[in-house]
């Protein structure tokens, strides 16, 4: 059985812990907290009521039993009530003028990079990283998998050189030489 880095590829995909596991280069990644809020469907005339998700200054996902509002982007964690108020205020134009009844909330950290692009690519001869997908992980993580697999297998990458450079793990080195290390989140 090969050990780490001997004859087989290793992929580090450990959110913010990837920063400590990738020792060959400094990654500017960290946790940024966010909160989703579930509210009772607001009392809005049926002609004005949403029937589809809205994404903009936050997002609103209407449902029969609850609507979901989100999401905060907190460099340092906020009190839940502050986050709820932010989500309601950010989406007020879709919620009508009546009272809003919060039902519950869910808080979590998301790993992000200093430039908000995911970190995807080779960090040494046998190691790749996939991290900092932020709130777009359901789109960028499968893309990361295809990039890493194509590199491991020696295939043509499924992205332009510009896209590869924007996600490359070594992109922080030159920036840090100019400005120092940028701290991300908590």
Stretch-by-stretch model annotation:
Residues 16-125:
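Active-site substrate-recognition segment that forms the wall
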Residues 7-8, 34, 88, 117, ...:
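A generic alpha-helix preference that emphasizes hydrophobic side chains
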Residues 100-186:
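C-terminal catalytic lobe of FAD-dependent flavoproteins
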């Amino acid at each position: 059985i090969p050990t780490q880095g001997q004859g087989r590829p290793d992929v580090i995909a450990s959110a913010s812990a990837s920063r400590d596991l990738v020792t060959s280069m400094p990654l500017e990644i960290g946790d940024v907290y966010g909160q989703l809020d579930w509210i009772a469907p607001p009392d809005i005339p049926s002609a004005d009521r949403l029937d589809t998700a809205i994404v903009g200054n936050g997002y609103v996902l209407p449902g029969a039993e609850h609507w979901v509002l989100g999401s905060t982007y907190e460099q340092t964690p906020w009190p839940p009530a502050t986050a709820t108020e932010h989500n309601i205020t950010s989406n007020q134009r879709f919620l009508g003028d009546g009272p809003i009844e919060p039902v519950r909330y869910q808080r979590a950290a998301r790993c992000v990079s200093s430039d908000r692009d995911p970190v995807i690519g080779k960090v040494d001869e046998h190691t790749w990283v996939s991290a900092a997908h932020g709130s777009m992980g359901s789109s960028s993580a499968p893309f990361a998998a295809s990039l890493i697999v194509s590199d491991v297998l020696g295939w043509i990458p499924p992205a332009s050189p510009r896209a590869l450079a924007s996600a490359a793990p070594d992109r922080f080195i030159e920036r840090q030489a100019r400005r120092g290390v940028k701290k991300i989140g908590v």
